[in-house]
Amino acid sequence: IYHGNRLLPGAKEFVEWLYREEKEFLFLTNSSRYTPKELQKKLEWMGLDVDQSHFYTSALATAAFISTQTPEATAYAVGEHGLQNALYDAGITVNEIHPDYVIIGEADNYCYDHIVKATKFVNDGARLIGTNYDLTGPVEGGIVPACRALMAPIELATGKQAYYVRSW
């Protein structure tokens, strides 16, 4: 529906038609970076009024998946606040004490320390989960490493393959 900070041509008219015709709709994103509220505000800034209930992110899909697999799960999570909030809202405790899962999403602050901790936790038995299978992601002016690129050093160091959650 948008690229960068611009609506795609016809997007506004299409969404207005969906509302006018009382169609049910949901915007899916394989990004774990933002919360539905933030996505709502971004579209509002672009001139499109869409309720936050119409957004489903890979962070929400990951949190839902984990909460069905392991009620009261614990996780070491590397990712932005969209992921952290989704895990919290799903009742998943984020900590660094024998986590059940290591979860990797898009992260601006990704560093060697994250790789070291994630490797230790996976070697100690934590299950390795990626919020999406994207190797790169588009940004204004090019591409950036995405979830699978951030996951690669952990998979290589542990010899374990991550499970990647699909949001669609």
Per-segment meaning from a language model:
Residues 1-168:
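HAD-like aspartate-dependent phosphatase fold
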